[in-house]
């Protein structure tokens, strides 16, 4: 476990994965919420549509913190309609400089028809290599599985589902109760 994960007992508790392939972008996440070594909830929805439904997102980290960030991102999307990258950069600036937001412990993956991004509390706004990125405690396992499946004939949703299953086989903080959201790409 990373040092940043030790500061909040709810930090380690999910896997979120995005894959962009074949005219579709998909974000999937498991439903497990753990505090320490105890599973508190197995069917949490950590992936959802944002804005006017033209952006999808998923979060890893403290749930209340993530919902605060989703609300802030939705406000930025209203301010910059159709400009996910601009909205994400503006949120990242606020996240990094605002005293209250700086303490929030969460990461987000967001995507629209054109771009997929990871947002972190350190002000990073990252676009994935090859259209694949993952966050959370099982993120590295899901990412490796998705990269291995990317060159197959499987579609984006199948890759996300299979990769999250593989992560659940390895990571004790990830389960198989998966939520998926997708959008057609431009």
From Swiss-Prot:
PANTHER family according to UniProt: ATP-DEPENDENT PROTEASE SUBUNIT HSLV, METALLOPROTEASE TLDD
PROSITE patterns recorded: PROTEASOME_BETA_2
Enzyme Commission number, as recorded: 3.4.25.2
Family as reported in the entry's similarity comment: Belongs to the peptidase T1B family. HslV subfamily.
Xref: InterPro entries: ATP-dep_Prtase_HsIV_su, Ntn_hydrolases_N, Proteasome_sua/b, Proteasome_suB-type
TM ranges: none
Disulfide pattern: none
Function recorded in the entry: Protease subunit of a proteasome-like degradation complex believed to be a general protein degrading machinery.
Main location class: cytoplasm
Name of the protein: ATP-dependent protease subunit HslV
Record-annotated active site: 14
Organism domain of life: Bacteria
Organism: Bradyrhizobium diazoefficiens (strain JCM 10833 / BCRC 13528 / IAM 13628 / NBRC 14792 / USDA 110)
EC category name: hydrolase
Regulation: Allosterically activated by HslU binding.
Keyword terms: Allosteric enzyme, Cytoplasm, Hydrolase, Metal-binding, Protease, Sodium, Threonine protease
Keyword Metal-binding on entry: yes
Gene Ontology BP terms: proteolysis involved in protein catabolic process
Gene Ontology terms: cellular component: cytoplasm; HslUV protease complex; proteasome core complex
Record's subcellular location: Cytoplasm
Presence of keyword Repressor: no
SUPFAM superfamilies named among the record's database cross-references: N-terminal nucleophile aminohydrolases (Ntn hydrolases) (SSF56235)
UniProt cross-references to Pfam families, sorted A to Z: Proteasome
GO terms of molecular function: metal ion binding; threonine-type endopeptidase activity
Quaternary structure note: A double ring-shaped homohexamer of HslV is capped on each side by a ring-shaped HslU homohexamer. The assembly of the HslU/HslV complex is dependent on binding of ATP.
């Amino acid at each position: 476990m990373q040092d940043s994960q030790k500061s909040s007992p709810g930090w380690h508790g999910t896997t979120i994965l995005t894959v962009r392939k074949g005219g579709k972008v998909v974000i999937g996440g498991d439903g497990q919420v753990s505090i320490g070594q105890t599973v508190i909830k197995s069917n949490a929805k950590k992936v959802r549509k944002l804005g006017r439904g033209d952006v999808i997102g998923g979060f890893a980290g403290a749930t209340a913190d993530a919902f605060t960030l989703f609300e802030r991102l939705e406000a930025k999307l209203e301010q910059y309609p159709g400009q996910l990258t601009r909205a994400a950069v503006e949120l990242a600036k606020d996240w990094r400089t605002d005293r209250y937001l700086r303490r929030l412990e969460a990461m987000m993956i967001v995507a629209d028809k054109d771009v997929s991004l990871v947002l972190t509390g350190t002000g990073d706004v990252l676009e994935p290599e090859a259209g694949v990125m993952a966050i959370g405690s099982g993120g590295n396992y899901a990412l490796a599985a998705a990269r291995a499946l990317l060159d197959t004939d499987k579609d984006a949703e199948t890759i996300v589902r299979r990769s999250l299953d593989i992560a659940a086989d390895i990571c004790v903080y990830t389960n198989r109760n998966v939520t998926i959201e997708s959008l057609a790409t431009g």
